[in-house]
Structures are given as structure tokens and as C-alpha cells.
Curated annotation (Swiss-Prot):
Localization per Swiss-Prot or TrEMBL: Cytoplasm
Organism: Staphylococcus aureus (strain NCTC 8325 / PS 47)
Oligomeric form and interacting partners: Forms a cylinder of 14 subunits composed of two heptameric rings stacked back-to-back. Interacts with the co-chaperonin GroES.
Gene name as annotated: groEL
Lineage: Bacteria, Bacillati, Bacillota, Bacilli, Bacillales
NCBIfam families: GroEL, PRK00013.1, PRK12849.1, PRK12850.1, PRK12851.1
Chain sites annotated for binding ATP: 29-32, 86-90, 413, 476-478, 492
Pfam families in the cross-refs: Cpn60_TCP1
UniProt function note: Together with its co-chaperonin GroES, plays an essential role in assisting protein folding. The GroEL-GroES system forms a nano-cage that allows encapsulation of the non-native substrate proteins and provides a physical environment optimized to promote and accelerate protein folding.
GO MF term list: ATP binding; ATP-dependent protein folding chaperone; isomerase activity; unfolded protein binding
Similarity comment: family membership: Belongs to the chaperonin (HSP60) family.
Protein name stated in the entry: Chaperonin GroEL
Catalysed conversion reaction: ATP + H2O + a folded polypeptide = ADP + phosphate + an unfolded polypeptide
């Protein structure tokens, strides 16, 4: 592959063209009067969206230098989405503003390293000021407001608020496509795992084909149970207590399964057997989660425990268990609260440390099952195109709401960034460092300016009035009114605003300190000469 190089001003200007192309496509979506962007999909219907990171990921430019510039801004959107889950359009607008202003100064002779120091200094002060202005999210109504602003839909905000209220802030909220027109919320309380009863003869309700156990005992083991004699001493103790038992094992088979079913049908005792969830190491971890939730002890060779020696005090308990053909749901396990809290803290640490998206998702599911439950928002729409667009908006709104619960909220509509303008302007600096601070100062007004322009207004006029307004007072572009943003529920999560600013500044600083760009130039394939026709061939 042939490489081509560009240096200094040539390199930066070529990359800037790419930055502008991507940012201009993304920034039309910002604000309540932002527009949509249509993305061509090769094998499906076009996707209509206003989600910044989704648009950014689709952009691939022909010129390799311009494409590198676009990829840098794409990285801003990706990183912001990864950390905060929303605010990708704001981050893109901030990055473009810093890069454009910074490049003017570099072209005029400013030292990029000095500019970088100034940018870093200004962003640090701005982030501190954002946290000072931040307010905690304290009630269901405020959670609904955050979701509604992000999705531009009050109904979506309400669904997310209800879901978080029912499953807790650490609970899993999943978004699925519905077959109908309406969007619905479905909540599964307690721990649910995707394993059902091993025999339909174990059901307690033959109409619903469900086994419902009240105040059951739990036998949790990673062993295969083939012989009924292995568990008979334990079952005799359970029968004396006149309570049902749920057996969670690697497999219940042969003589053991037959006798459990026969005794169930005779009415001797009620026992339901289910396979242990997960596979390999994940199975062991999930069995430990279940044991901690119910107060059971895992019967495993790792601890030198055998089924024949198991006693009733090694079993867990819960207020209720429901077992269907496919799922088992445990409600209100009787495990020790301190042990559950310790397990939750351990899972949170593992989530922070893991670098695998798949592992993170599985750990979050386990955390939710221990901490609260699972809520499913089933998205409905009239067409597939609308369904995809609506699903993306709900995903952003959910991420935004989680971020708000974590770090609080600030005034929305770009107001929070202008509110820290004064603090940043008070930074004492000289020369190129001062210029770097000024680059950030100008960028802080860019989101408000763009929101106003998308609403068909003059951005500069709105920005100047906002600089002189009381903190928290901002411009509501949806109604063209000046209001107290927090009181009106026009809010942004502090984490989203902070992440957008930090990632935009990071990429802008790297861009400005770039002096050479190396691009791969695809080699042109020379057309092969046509082969002569063979005798007898057409």
C-alpha cells in the first residue's frame, strides 16, 4: 500500500474539511427544532434519525485526509456515548467550534502546545463550575423530565421514570421492538433467569402451565443429580417442614427426576427442578448470586460439600418463586442484606474494570437481578422506519436519565455551558495559554448558538442575552421564550454535559498539535487484458 504525506497547514486544512462535513451533518439535529438525517442502508429501508453518534458512524469520506478529520470527530461522539450514553451532538458541535477557532490561531502563528495548555486549563475550571451548579435528581418527576427532554417526548420520559422507580437505579431496563403500534412497559420484579421446569408434571397451575411456590426452600448446586438417594435425606427434612422446594442443579435426571415427579403427582411433597443458568465460569457466578439472594449455600466440590451431607440449614428461602416452561423468577429472597450489598459492590467494581462490552452487559444483568429487577420497554410504531428512529431516541433518553441520577442535572439547552462562561473568563493566563482559554470560551456558546439557528433565530443575539441573564435562566427554543430552565424541566445530565466538553477538548487539542498526516492511497487496479476466445467457446 502506497503512503502519502501532508504537512502542517496543508494537513490541518484537509482534515478540517472532513471535520466540517461530519459536524455539519450532525449539528442540524440539535435542539427541540432540530431536523432529522436520513441514512442509506444497503439491505433495509433508510434509517431516519437525529442521534448524533448513529449519524457520525455512517460517514465515510472519499478523500483519506478529510476522512481522518471526520474520524477524529467520530471518536468524540463515540467516547461521549460510551461514557454518558447521550450528548453526542453537543460534543460534536463543541469539537468543531474548538478546532475551527484553534486552527485560526495556529495559522496566525500561535504555538499549538500553548493552546493545548490553555484548553486543558479552561476545561478543568468549566467542569468544576458545572459540578458546583449541578443539582441532584430527587424524585420521579425530575427523572421523567430528563428522559422527556432527551427523547423530545413526554410519554417516553414517563415510561423511563416508571421503569426506574420499579426496578431501582441499578435495575436492568431493556428496549425491545413490539409487534403493535403502542409503546408499553413490562416489569419483572426479582431475579429472573432463562431456565424453566425440567418436567411439565411439576406445574401447580395446569391452566397457565406454571409452577408457583410460596415460601419455598432452595437447593443450589453445580452437580448433576442422577440418584434420588443422594437427595432423599434432605427431602425428608423438607417434607417435615411442609414447604415446597426448588432444586437448581446442573441437571436433574434419571431416577432422581422420576421420583420427584411421582411424589409431586401423589401429593407427597412439591418439588420443582430447573437447570442452572449460564455456562462455565458464568454459571458458577450466577449460582453464587442466587445463593446470596436466597441465603443458601452452594453445594459444590470446590467447598468439599456433598449432596448426601446437605442439611436444611444449607437451603435458601424466598417469599415466592414462579417457574414457567422457559423462565424462573425469584421474588424477595431471604438472603442477608449485608451479603447482598457486598455482592452488588463487587459487581459494580467488575463492571468498571472490564474492557469487554459483552462481559459488561452480562455483569450489569447480574447486578440488576440482585439489586431490583428487569423492566422492558416495548417500542411500537406504524412503520419499521419509525420504529428504529423511536427506539434510538428511547435508548438515548434512558442513558441520559441514568447519567442524571449518577451526577445530577444542570440547566438544559446549552445554558449550563454559558453559565460557566464567567468562571472560565476569570482564569489568569498570558500569551498562547490565554488564547487557548479563549478558544474554549467561544466554544462554550456554540451549542446555544446552533440550537437557536436550528430554530430559525439569530444565534449571536441569544448568546449575548444569555451571558447577561441570571444563572439557570435560558432560552426555550421550543416556545421562543426566556424561562428558568430548571423550573420548566428543561435540564441536561451533568455527566452528559461534562463528558461532551472533556472529549471535545481532548480531540481538539490533539488536532491542533498535529504537524504531519500519513494516509494510505489505494492502488488502482490495472484492467487485465481480455483472454482470447478458446475454440468452440462463445
Amino acid at each position: 500500500m502506497v503512503k502519502q504525506l501532508k504537512f502542517s497547514e496543508d494537513a490541518r486544512q484537509a482534515m478540517l474539511r472532513g471535520v466540517d462535513q461530519l459536524a455539519n451533518a450532525v449539528k442540524v439535529t440539535i435542539g427541540p427544532k432540530g431536523r432529522n438525517v436520513v441514512l442509506d442502508k444497503e439491505f433495509t429501508a433508510p434509517l431516519i434519525t437525529n442521534d448524533g453518534v448513529t449519524i457520525a458512524k455512517e460517514i465515510e469520506l472519499e478523500d483519506p485526509y478529510e476522512n481522518m478529520g471526520a474520524k477524529l470527530v467520530q471518536e468524540v461522539a463515540n467516547k461521549t456515548n460510551e461514557i454518558a450514553g447521550d450528548g453526542t451532538t453537543t460534543a460534536t458541535v463543541l469539537a468543531q467550534a474548538m478546532i475551527q477557532e484553534g486552527l485560526k490561531n495556529v495559522t496566525s502563528g500561535a504555538n499549538p502546545v500553548g493552546l493545548r495548555q490553555g484548553i486543558d486549563k479552561a476545561v478543568k475550571v468549566a467542569v468544576e463550575a458545572l459540578h458546583e451548579n449541578s443539582q441532584k435528581v430527587e424524585n420521579k418527576n425530575e427523572i421523567a423530565q430528563v428522559g422527556a427532554i432527551s427523547a423530545a417526548d413526554e410519554e417516553i420520559g414517563r415510561y423511563i421514570s416508571e421503569a426506574m422507580e420499579k426496578v431501582g437505579n441499578d435495575g436492568v431496563i431493556t428496549i425491545e421492538e413490539s409487534n403493535g403500534l403502542n409503546t408499553e412497559l413490562e416489569v419483572v420484579e426479582g431475579m429472573q433467569f432463562d431456565r424453566g421446569y425440567q418436567s411439565p408434571y411439576m406445574v401447580t397451575d395446569s391452566d397457565k402451565m406454571v409452577a408457583e411456590l410460596e415460601r419455598p426452600y432452595f437447593l443450589v448446586t453445580d452437580k448433576k443429580i442422577s440418584s434420588f438417594q443422594d437427595i432423599l435425606p434432605l427431602l425428608e427434612q423438607v417434607v417435615q417442614s411442609n414447604r415446597p422446594i426448588l432444586i437448581v442443579a446442573d441437571e436433574v435426571e434419571g431416577d432422581a427426576l422420576t421420583n420427584i415427579v411421582l411424589n409431586r403427582m401423589r401429593g407427597t411433597f412439591t418439588a420443582v427442578a430447573v437447570k442452572a443458568p449460564g455456562f462455565g465460569d458464568r454459571r458458577k457466578a450466577m449460582l453464587e448470586d442466587l445463593a446470596i439472594l436466597t441465603g443458601a449455600q452452594v453445594i459444590t466440590d470446590d467447598l468439599g460439600l456433598d449432596l448426601k451431607d446437605a442439611s436444611i440449614d444449607m437451603l435458601g428461602t424466598a417469599s415466592k418463586v414462579e417457574v414457567t416452561k422457559d423462565n424462573t423468577t425469584v421474588v424477595d429472597g431471604d438472603g442477608d442484606e449485608n451479603s447482598i450489598d457486598a455482592r452488588v459492590s463487587q459487581l459494580k467494581s467488575q463492571i468498571e474494570e472490564t474492557e469487554s462490552d459483552f462481559d459488561r452487559e452480562k455483569l450489569q444483568e447480574r447486578l440488576a437481578k440482585l439489586a431490583g429487577g428487569v423492566a422492558v420497554i416495548k417500542v411500537g410504531a406504524a412503520s419499521e422506519t419509525e420504529l428504529k428512529e423511536r427506539k434510538l431516541r428511547i435508548e438515548d433518553a434512558l442513558n441520559s436519565t441514568r447519567a442524571a441520577v449518577e451526577e445530577g442535572i444542570v440547566a438544559g439547552g446549552g445554558t449550563a455551558l454559558v453559565n460557566v462562561y464567567q468562571k472560565v473568563s476569570e482564569i489568569e493566563a498570558e500569551g498562547d495559554i490565554e488564547t487557548g482559554v479563549n478558544i474554549v470560551l467561544k466554544a462554550l456558546t456554540a451549542p446555544v448558538r446552533q440550537i437557536a439557528e436550528n430554530a430559525g433565530l439569530e444565534g449571536s443575539v441569544i448568546v449575548e442575552r444569555l451571558k447577561n441573564a441570571e444563572p439557570g435562566v435560558g432560552f426555550n427554543a421550543a416556545t421562543n421564550e426566556w424561562v428558568n430552565m430548571l423550573e420548566e424541566g428543561i435540564v441536561d445530565p451533568t455527566k452528559v454535559t461534562r463528558s461532551a466538553l472533556q472529549h471535545a477538548a481532548s480531540v481538539a487539542a490533539m488536532f491542533l498539535t498535529t504537524e504531519a498526516v500519513v494516509a494510505s492511497i489505494p492502488e488502482k487496479n490495472n484492467d487485465q487484458p481480455n483472454m482470447g476466445g478458446m475454440p468452440g467457446m462463445m
